[in-house]
Amino acid sequence: MKTAALLFALIVSGSVFAKNISFTYFGNQGGNQSYYACSYVEDQTQSYLELLGATNIDVRCSGGISGGWSMQPVSIRASYDMAEVTGTSVELVEIKGDYSNSACGLNVKIIKEILKTLTNVEVLKKDDSCAFVTSNYYFKLNIAH
């Protein structure tokens, strides 16, 4: 009986689709090399996924700046679920970064990798040219639900 109720709840609640991203960010921008702590990269990835509607998120990072002062590119792997698009609503989302929220190249890379996996997002406007770590970036997105 419990199994039937659980199956019914899953069918009624709609479908979810498992997604994942995996990439390495080398940190080359503006003629400079940038390195990041994995905790920062994981937090940024998690926050963008949540903003774009992901659930059941698992983000893993390797490399980066470690306790022994080792500095390597960061490799990110994330798995997450996205709900099926029902087409009943659209949400406008803006993502902005400026000099006070640096790491332009890293943040733009994370956003672009996530967007590659989403069919329900339309990019209306973007400024993603990161000449420097402190460059501004901007994405204006329509997200269908």
Question: Language-model features: where?
Answer:
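Extracellular/luminal Pro/Thr/Ser-rich low-complexity repeat and linker "mucin-like" segments
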Residues: 35-41, 101-110
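Acidic/histidine-rich, surface-exposed loop or edge segments in extracytoplasmic proteins
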Residues: 18-33, 87-102
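Ser/Thr-rich, low-complexity intrinsically disordered terminal regions
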Residues: 46, 52-84, 91-106, 116-145
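N-terminal secretory signal peptides
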Residues: 19-66
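Positively charged n-region of N-terminal signal peptides that target proteins for export
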Residues: 1-5
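N-terminal signal peptide c-region/cleavage motif recognized by signal peptidases
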Residues: 13-15
